Each structure stands twice: as C-alpha cells, then as structure tokens.
Amino acid sequence: RVKVSFVKQPEYYAQRLASGDLAQKYISACGYDELNIIPWKGCLISSVCRFCGVNSVAVKNPNDALHAAHLRTGALGWEAARASYLGNLSESINLALQTECYSEHMHVILISGNLPDDQLDQQADIYCDIAAHIKGQVAPKCTEGIVAVITPPHDLARLYKLKQAGVAIVVFNLEVGNDPWFSKYCPGKSALGRDFFIERLKHAATVFGRGKSWTNFVLGLEPVDELLALCEKLAGYGIVSSANVLHVDEGSQLDCVPPTKETVIHFFHGLAQINLRYGFDAFYCAKALRTSLSNEFQDGRWA
C-alpha cells in the first residue's frame, strides 16, 4: 500500500495586499520550496508548442491579470504597469517570506510565456526590471540566486544586462533537442531556429559562468539516446540539462503518450552520469521539481 499526500497550499495564497489583490496573483509555489514569479499570463510565440497548455490556463485567470497581449507594441505596455506591479510583487514576497514553506530556503524562478518574436529583447528588459527590484529582498533565502526562465533575446548584450540586474542563472528551454521532433513539437521555437537557442546557451555559459546556463527538455518526445547525446554535447560547453517527464496538459495537441518507467530510468541514470563527469548538480533540490527525477538519481535514490 502506498500512502499519497499532497503539498500543502502556502498560507500566503489566501492573504490580500493593501491593493486588495491576493498575493497569489503575483507569486506562486511549486513543489515545497519554489517561489515562482509569473509576470504575465499567456504566450504569444508564433506557434505554440504542441505539449503546452499555457494559453488554455491563461483564459481562466482573473480578468485584471496582466497578459502577454497587454505588452504588445503599441499597447499600454510595461511602462504603464511597472510601478504598481513591482510594488505588489514586493509586498507579496514579504508575505511569502514569513511562511513555513520557505523557512529553510527558496528557489526564486522568474518565468513566463513568450512575448512575440520581435519583442524578445523587451521581454529580457522586463525581466531585468523585476530582478533588479527584488534581488535584495530575496537574497537571504535564495539558494542559487534568481533563475530566469526565458526565451533568449536577439541582442546578446541583453545577457550582460540580465546578469547586472541580478539574474544568476538563465534557462533557455529547447524542450525537444533534435529534429525532426523539435520542428514537429515546437514549431514556434523552430521558427526562431534550433541554433538560435543553442548559440545563446553557449554564450550565456561565458556570461554567467559554467553551469549557470540551463536548458530543459520534455522527456518522451524524442529518442532517449539521441537526447542524451545532445545533453553530453551541451555539457561540454558548460550547459546543464534536465527534463520533465511528459504529462498531457489541458490544451495540448499531442499524438504520443508519456514514456515508460524503463525509459525514464534510462534517461535520468544517463543524465546523472553526464552531470557527474562534468561536475554539475541537478536543478534546484529534491523538494522542488516534481515532474523531474534529476535530484533522485543524483542522490542515488532510484534503485
């Protein structure tokens, strides 16, 4: 018999700010110790990844939530929203810092859907504003510094700007490593180009440091051995890889099923060996990501 328990909802989810907003409008928890900052809802990439349901979820959010569409060129934009957003974000983080789930530490993750392809530099600028505003506030509890999960900017100088703003690690998620599967399952990312991501991952490793340029994959969308070969190649450039096991979200457009237990074991065992050879650690800690087994395999808790 297996006992199943669920992560307790943090106290701050029910707390209101001076503005009347709920704190969970600005921050959210994942696993036991992640603090996720999702500045806007929705994704305006040219063509959505087929496994992703982010735009299905976005329509269920409060009508006054900031949406990627509000940040389109010519819209009211970030300049109009910035001051109130940053103030409410700081107040929300103050509430979160008082809760039990972050008593030991927290993994601060800045993450969102894409702005349109021609606004990726602006997206990086918005992340800079947020990171610069909160870096001192989260520093005492923030294990690895602020982690920015973002589609890479066109302008490589934005990587230096992100670092100066307080971002410690950048995550440019390929999601699928190799063609033809990359083009099939991530048509919008494919339009930007696989090399667009890989070259910026490599450059980020020189800007932020070896082991501080990350990419994630969806395990189950391509042959495992080809994916592991790419993870090994990326590790040689100082890039750390991981994966979430495929799960079918509401709104996904998939023609495949999640991988078998044997496939999951084969991949994460292989990835743990790569990380060991290159001196890398798995992302975050075992309390955080619950759709990945990187930490369990690193700690030898899989057998």
Annotated model-derived regions:
Residues 1, 228-303:
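Auxiliary Fe-S-binding modules of radical SAM enzymes
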Residues 1-48, 55-79, 303:
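N-terminal [4Fe-4S]-dependent radical SAM core
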Residues 38-41, 73-87, 146-153, 220-222:
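Active-site mouth loops of central-metabolism enzymes
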Residues 49, 110, 172, 215, ...:
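Conserved, mostly hydrophobic/aromatic
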Residues 56-109:
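Conserved alpha-helical substructure of the radical SAM core
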Residues 78-85, 89, 123, 189-193, ...:
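Residue-level preference for long, well-ordered alpha-helices that form the structural scaffold
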Residues 98-101, 113-257:
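Conserved AdoMet/S-adenosylmethionine-binding subsite of the radical SAM
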